[in-house]
C-alpha cells in the first residue's frame, strides 16, 4: 500500500524543506489538497523542480473546468475530484493526464461510482474533509468491502484517520493508497510514522468484527443440504475461492477452499464419482473470535506453519459470523 503524504499538513516549515524531508524518507506520493485555490498549481510547478515523486492532487471545486488548462500545464500523476462539490456532470477532456479518481465522504454511498466507471479509483474520505487529525469512521470498512465487491479491478484510496492499526487493516482489505497528514507530521519523525504505517507489529483497539467480511456476504453451504458437487458449485459461483460449511443453527463445521477441492480430486482421481464432502472439507480450520484484536490475529498467524489465506470468524458459541480474507492483502501491496 502506498503512503501519500499530505504536504500542507506541515504548517511550520517551508514547502521545499517538507518535500526534501519526504523524499529523504522515500514517501510514495505527495498528496496536494486544492480547495478551489488555483495558486496550488504554483506549488505543483515548484515541486516538479525539486522532486520526481508522483503528485496526488485532490481537487475540491464546483467548477473543475476552471482548472483544465492548469492541469494541462501542470500534469499530475493522480487526479481526484470531490463528488459532493460537483454541481454538473463531470466531462473531463481526454488530454488531461494522470490516473483519475472520485472522492466521497463517509455519508455518500459507493454506488455513485457507476457514474465514473471509466475512472481508475475511488478515494474514501474516512473523516470529515478538511479536518486534520480526525478519527477513522469504522463504517468505511463496510464501504471498502462493498466497493471491492462491485468493482474488483478498481483501486481504493483512503484519506483520514489512518494510524498504524488502521493501516494494517486497510492493507488487509486491499486498499492501494492511504493519505497521511497530521499522523505523519506530528510524529517524533516522519521515518517513525512511516514505519508505523507499514510495519506488521501494531497496537490494537479495533476488533475482528469491525472489518471482517460478514457471513451474509460469504459463500455458505449446509452439510445436510448440499452434496460435494453442490458445494464445489457454491465455491465457484462465490468467486472468493472458498465456502463456509455450517450446521442448521449456523455453527461452523468447516471450510472448503479451492485448494481443498484439488486435494479431494487428487485423492479420488480414479473414482471421481466417489468424492464426498469429507474429501474436500477442512473440518478443523484455523478460526478466530469476532472479539479478538488485530494484535491477537497477528499472534495467531505467527503460530502457523502454513500460509493462511482464509480465516473463519466465530462467536463465543462457535457460530460462523464472517471471514478474514487475506487474498486482498496481496492487492494492497502491489
Segments (PLM) and residue ranges:
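Glycine-rich phosphate-binding active-site loops on the catalytic face of alpha/beta enzymes
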Residues: 79-87, 123-135, 172-195
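Short loop-to-alpha-helix "cap/lid" segments that border enzyme active sites
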Residues: 44-50, 83-169
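Conserved beta-strand positions in the central sheet of alpha/beta enzyme cores
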Residues: 4, 30-31, 56-58, 78-80, ...
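The conserved cystathionine-beta-synthase
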Residues: 220-240, 246-247, 265, 287-308, ...
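Conserved N-terminal beta1-alpha1 strand-loop-helix module at the mouth
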Residues: 1-78, 86, 114-119, 164-165, ...
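Short hydrophobic beta-strand motif reused across regulatory alpha/beta modules
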Residues: 254-259, 321-329
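Glycine-rich beta-to-alpha transition loops that act as phosphate-gripper elements at the mouths
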Residues: 6-13, 59-64, 103-111, 155-165, ...
Amino acid at each position: 500500500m502506498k503512503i501519500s503524504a499530505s504536504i500542507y499538513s506541515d504548517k511550520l516549515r517551508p514547502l521545499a524543506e517538507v518535500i526534501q524531508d519526504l523524499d529523504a524518507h522515500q514517501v510514495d506520493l505527495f498528496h496536494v489538497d486544492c480547495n478551489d485555490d488555483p495558486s496550488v498549481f504554483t506549488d505543483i510547478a515548484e515541486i516538479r523542480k525539486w522532486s520526481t515523486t508522483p503528485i496526488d492532487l485532490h481537487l475540491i471545486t464546483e467548477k473543475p473546468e476552471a482548472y483544465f488548462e492548469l492541469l494541462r500545464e501542470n500534469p499530475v500523476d493522480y487526479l481526484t475530484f470531490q463528488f459532493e462539490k460537483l454541481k454538473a456532470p463531470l466531462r473531463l477532456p481526454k488530454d488531461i493526464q494522470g490516473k483519475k479518481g472520485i472522492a466521497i465522504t463517509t455519508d455518500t454511498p459507493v454506488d455513485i461510482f457507476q457514474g465514473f466507471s471509466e475512472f481508475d479509483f475511488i478515494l474514501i474520505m474516512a473523516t470529515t474533509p478538511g479536518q486534520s487529525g480526525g478519527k477513522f469512521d469504522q463504517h468505511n470498512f463496510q464501504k471498502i468491502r462493498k466497493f471491492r465487491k462491485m468493482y474488483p479491478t478498481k483501486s481504493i484510496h483512503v484519506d483520514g484517520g489512518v494510524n498504524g492499526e488502521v493501516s494494517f487493516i486497510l492493507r488487509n482489505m486491499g486498499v492501494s493508497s492511504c493519505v497521511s497528514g497530521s499522523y505523519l507530521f506530528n510524529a517524533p519523525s516522519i521515518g517513525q510514522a512511516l514505519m508505523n504505517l507499514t510495519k506488521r507489529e501494531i497496537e490494537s483497539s479495533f476488533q475482528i468484527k469491525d472489518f471482517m467480511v460478514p457471513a451474509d456476504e460469504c459463500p455458505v453451504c449446509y452439510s445436510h443440504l448440499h452434496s460435494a458437487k453442490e458445494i464445489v458449485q457454491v465455491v465457484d459461483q462465490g468467486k472468493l475461492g472458498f465456502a463456509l460449511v455450517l450446521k442448521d443453527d449456523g455453527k461452523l463445521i468447516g471450510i472448503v477452499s479451492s485448494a481443498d477441492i484439488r486435494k479431494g480430486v487428487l485423492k479420488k482421481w480414479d473414482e471421481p464419482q466417489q468424492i464426498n464432502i469429507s474429501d474436500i472439507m477442512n473440518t478443523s480450520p484455523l478460526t478466530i473470535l469476532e472479539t479478538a484484536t488485530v494484535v491477537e490475529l497477528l499472534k495467531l498467524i505467527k503460530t502457523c506453519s502454513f500460509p493462511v489465506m482464509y480465516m473463519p470468524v466465530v462467536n463465543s458459541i462457535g457460530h460462523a459470523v464472517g471471514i478474514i480474507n487475506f487474498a486482498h492483502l496481496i492487492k494492497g501491496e502491489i
